[in-house]
Amino acid sequence: MFGKKKKIKDTKGGMSPRSNRESVKTRAAAAGRVRIHHQNAQRQAMPDSTPSPSEFLYISNGAHYDQVIERIKTVKKTLWIGTADIKDLYVKDGRGTKPLLEVLSDLAKRGVEIRLIHAKEPGPAFRQDFDKYPALIEGMERVLCPRVHFKIIVFDLKAAYVGSANLTGAGLGMKGENTRNFEAGILSTNRDFVKNAAEQFDNVWMGAHCKGCKRKEFCGDPIG
């Protein structure tokens, strides 16, 4: 089963919660691409080189699939996804299609650290697909925060997407131009852009806003 998020291993199966925070921080520090500050382990992405300002790509509508989803397939070490809504999403596979979850499962098997923040539980089709990929139970961590409305994807802490598109077929997925949502976003490898996106994601991930949150009654399993 997809299961409820827990703060320890979910022995009944389902999407894995966050694992030990310290081990995650240690792995990131060892990778040498991030700096860790203060008790909330705020992370700053540090690309290997400073790209030119021209490396900002404006993405609209169907280009989200080609520029964002296809980039997910190329991740080597770290993938962070923040979305308000999450539904079953399919990607091209030769002449057919397959669930994005299969792509994420393949990444997890290769040791990619996958983090997912979402505002509400996924739909039933997504949950049914999830059960087919046991590698995600251990290989993908998640937190649920009902205040999340940002759409942020950080690729290997070297590139980031920030925009309007949710992790859905009509948002980032491969739905046709006449049925998909009208979306807009920015994809960039700019050092400051990636750092700011990663910091906002990590602040929510580490529960930096939980202490003063006034919506705790809507949060079934607080992050912090």
Where are these regions (language model features)?
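Short beta-strand scaffold segments in enzyme catalytic cores
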Residues: 151-154, 186
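Short solvent-exposed loop/turn micro-motifs enriched in small/polar/acidic residues
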Residues: 65, 143-147, 179
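PLD-like (HKD) phosphodiesterase/transphosphatidyltransferase domain
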Residues: 2-4, 32-116, 192
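Short, solvent-exposed loop/turn segments at secondary-structure junctions
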Residues: 85-87, 122, 166-168
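Short, charged/polar "capping" segments at the starts of alpha-helices
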Residues: 122-128
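Structural recognition of alpha->loop->beta junctions
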Residues: 130-146
